[in-house]
Every structure is written in structure tokens, then in C-alpha cells.
């Protein structure tokens, strides 16, 4: 069933509550990457144009004790958003109370107000993170309709997403709509052939994704640290490379039952120490010495993965191919990123997290059909789970 989107709502003159995802990195009071704010703009601008009185909610970081509040205020977000919109964003440094209620009552059509970090409510019994029913009800009482545009927290059942939805007509914002269309589309109705590329350090982080994707993807290309548990499961020596002993049986079973779908590295770059300055050797996957560890996939693997991608109609990528934060071990990730970016007839999707950061930093942002804003949310969606934040949005 299709979900309601913001354009299905009558917004003029209404107090529109919106859950956005402004969980951006802030250092010394300065936002170091405002991509999430940029992604939120289409929905915010639409609500303003339609004459809604916009009240924005978001969390920022984890608030465990009173001293955390100082560095986790949303005030820098209000300033950044204000510049982008070319108008004042009223910032209320409270999450409830008379000051907030009065500020909302005084809003005019097209005004924008940002409520302080919703996780400040976690200092009192984790009311936000545990979806305290009274808090959700209180926030809902401040508005007329609710728009959820925070895919990054769609896998969480919080007061500021699911809690508010319980009491108000709820629609998806444009960013949430895109995530449902593309990430949800991979799971529910992908255009075949489908190729999935999985990387990152641990098999354990991706087990449920793999279990779901073997029923969807024609090929699953595995790189990153997680590949070496599979290579060990084939009976090969992996030296000091990353290994999850307790996942070898899972890897063996998968290779036995779905071996024709799984594509593993054929070569890698190894080093004796975990450092960007370490001496690099390129070796076949069968020749990793006992005193060295694999830090990146090699050029032959990049070539192999590129070959496997040709002819795909849907490609989903989650996780880097090596220790991407070290420039000398980033070539595998860069190579795979370039291969996907060059595909002309495919829907290409990055499932958030480190791969999204890699594609953006490499300047390939515009070459992908969709780069997800959710890390954990993307993974859980790819696992085939129904996400609470999406479930709570009204059907059309």
C-alpha cells in the first residue's frame, strides 16, 4: 500500500510538525558536514510555500548526562538552515513548556521554528528513545498534521516519530518518499538482474542483509574485512586479516547453498601493520602470508567486480572495500565506486553509511540514482524488516 506524502496534505494555515534528520557532525560549534540539512530542504521549502506554520523536530547525537547538552544543541542547525532558506528560523532552546507553546501560537504562515534536540528528553528516563506515550501525545498536541522526513531514524520507535504519528494524520516527506521508493524498491520490487555489493568490517553487521539478499540478488559481491571470513571458510589462509571465527559456519553454509551467487576477492593488498604508511604488497587471495593482513581488495578484484556489474539493472552497495580512511588502501573502494557510477542503464543505490561518505567525498554524488541518508535504517530495510517510522505513516 502506498504511503501518504506531504503533497497529499492540506497545509495552509496549519501548524505542521515535521520530524527531520539533522543529526549532523558538529565540531567546536561548527557543522562539518551539512548534507542532511541539504537533503531536508525540498520538504521544508514545500511546507513554507504551501503556507504551513512549520515546527521542526530532530535529535542530535546521544544525550546521556547533563554535561552532554552543551555540545549537542541544535542552535548551529537553526543558523545553518536560516542561511539556506534566506529567512529566520526561530530556535526554541526547550523541548516542552510555555516558552515553546507561546512561540508556536505566534507563528505566521510560512514561518519556521526549530525545537531543541529531542534527546534532551532522554535525561529523564529516556522519554524520547523509549517512545514515552505522554511525550508523544504532548508533542502531537502542538500541531495539526505531522510529516516524517527522517529516514535515518525510521528503524527506531521514538516519541518524535512513532509517538507523534499515533495522534496525528501523518505523511512522508520527500526524502522519506525517495528512501521508500529506492531502498524499499530493492527489497520489494527490484528490476532484474540485481547485483549487491557488500563491504565493511564485519559479517555479523550484515548477516540478515545477506540472508535477505540471497533471495533477491542475482549476484552478491563481497569485499572489505568481512570477505576474509568467507575466504577462511573456503579453507584458505588469511594471515592476520579480519576474521569472525563464530561466523565461519554461516559463511560455509552460504557458499555451499548459494555459491553461484557469491563473488569473493581474487587478490588483495596486504601489509604488516595497520597504517597508511605500511609497505604494501599485492598478492593473490591464495598467497596471504601468516604475518600480514589484507587491507584492501586488489586491482584484479576491482576488474572482476566491474565485469559482474555489467548488464545489471539494479545495483545496491553498502560498505567500503578496504580501509578506506587510509588513502593508500582506498583504491578498491574508489574503483568499485567508479564502476557503479559509470553504469548507464541501471538504478544505482548506496545504502548509506561509509559508502555514501565515500561516494560524496569522491565527487560521484550525482552519478548515483540514490544515496541513502540512513545507516542503520538502510541496513534494516535491506534485511526486509518493516521499519516502525515508515509503518506509522498513514496509507493513501
UniProtKB/Swiss-Prot annotation:
Entry's EC annotation: 2.7.2.3
GO molecular function per UniProt: ADP binding; ATP binding; phosphoglycerate kinase activity
Keywords: ATP-binding, Cytoplasm, Glycolysis, Kinase, Nucleotide-binding, Transferase
Class in the EC hierarchy, top level: transferase
SUPFAM superfamilies per UniProt: Phosphoglycerate kinase
GO biological process, one term: gluconeogenesis
Keyword Nucleus: no
Self-association state and partner proteins as the record states: Monomer.
Protein name per Swiss-Prot or TrEMBL: Phosphoglycerate kinase
Origin species: Staphylococcus epidermidis (strain ATCC 35984 / DSM 28319 / BCRC 17069 / CCUG 31568 / BM 3577 / RP62A)
Gene from which the chain derives: pgk
Amino acid at each position: 500500500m502506498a504511503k501518504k506524502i506531504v503533497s497529499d496534505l492540506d497545509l495552509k494555515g496549519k501548524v505542521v510538525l515535521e520530524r527531520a534528520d539533522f543529526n549532523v557532525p558538529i565540531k567546536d560549534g561548527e557543522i562539518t558536514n551539512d548534507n542532511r540539512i541539504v537533503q531536508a530542504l525540498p520538504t521544508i521549502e514545500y511546507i513554507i510555500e504551501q503556507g504551513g506554520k512549520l515546527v521542526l523536530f530532530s535529535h542530535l547525537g546521544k544525550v546521556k548526562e547533563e554535561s552532554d547538552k552543551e555540545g549537542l544543541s541544535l542552535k548551529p542547525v537553526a543558523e545553518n538552515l536560516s542561511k539556506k532558506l534566506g529567512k529566520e528560523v526561530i530556535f526554541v532552546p526547550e523541548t516542552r513548556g510555555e516558552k515553546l507553546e507561546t512561540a508556536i501560537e505566534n507563528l505566521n504562515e510560512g514561518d519556521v521554528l526549530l525545537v531543541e534536540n529531542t534527546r534532551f528528553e532522554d535525561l529523564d528516563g529516556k522519554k524520547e528513545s523509549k517512545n514515552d506515550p505522554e511525550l508523544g501525545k504532548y508533542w502531537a498536541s502542538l500541531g495539526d498534521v505531522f510529516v516524517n522526513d527522517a529516514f535515518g531514524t525510521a528503524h527506531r520507535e521514538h516519541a518524535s516519530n512513532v509517538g507523534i504519528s499515533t495522534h496525528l494524520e501523518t505523511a512522508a516527506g520527500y526524502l522519506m518518499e525517495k528512501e521508500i521508493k529506492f531502498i524499499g524498491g530493492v527489497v520489494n520490487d527490484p528490476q532484474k538482474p540485481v547485483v549487491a555489493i557488500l563491504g565493511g568490517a564485519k559479517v555479523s553487521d550484515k548477516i540478515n542483509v545477506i540472508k535477505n539478499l540471497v533471495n533477491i540478488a542475482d549476484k552478491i559481491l563481497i569485499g572489505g574485512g568481512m570477505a576474509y571470513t568467507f575466504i577462511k571458510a573456503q579453507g584458505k589462509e588469511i594471515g592476520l586479516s579480519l576474521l569472525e571465527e563464530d561466523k565461519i559456519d554461516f559463511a560455509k553454509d552460504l557458499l555451499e547453498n548459494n555459491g553461484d551467487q557469491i563473488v569473493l576477492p581474487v587478490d588483495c593488498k596486504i601489509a604488516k601493520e595497520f597504517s597508511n604508511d605500511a609497505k604494501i604488497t599485492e598478492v593473490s587471495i591464495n598467497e596471504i602470508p601468516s604475518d600480514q593482513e589484507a587491507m584492501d581488495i586488489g586491482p584484479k578484484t576491482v576488474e572482476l567486480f566491474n565485469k559482474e556489474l555489467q548488464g545489471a539493472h539494479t545495483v545496491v552497495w553498502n560498505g567500503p572495500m578496504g580501509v578506506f580512511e587510509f588513502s593508500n588502501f582506498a583504491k578498491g573502494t574508489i574503483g568499485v565506486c567508479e564502476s557503479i557510477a559509470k553504469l548507464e542503464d541501471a538504478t544505482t543505490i548506496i545504502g548509506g553509511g561509509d559508502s555514501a561518505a565515500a561516494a560524496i567525498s569522491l565527487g560521484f554524488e550525482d552519478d548515483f540514482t540514490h544515496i541513502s541518508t540512513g545507516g542503520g535504517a538502510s541496513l534494516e530495510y535491506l534485511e526486509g524488516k518493516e521499519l516502525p517510522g515508515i509503518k506509522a505513516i498513514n496509507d493513501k
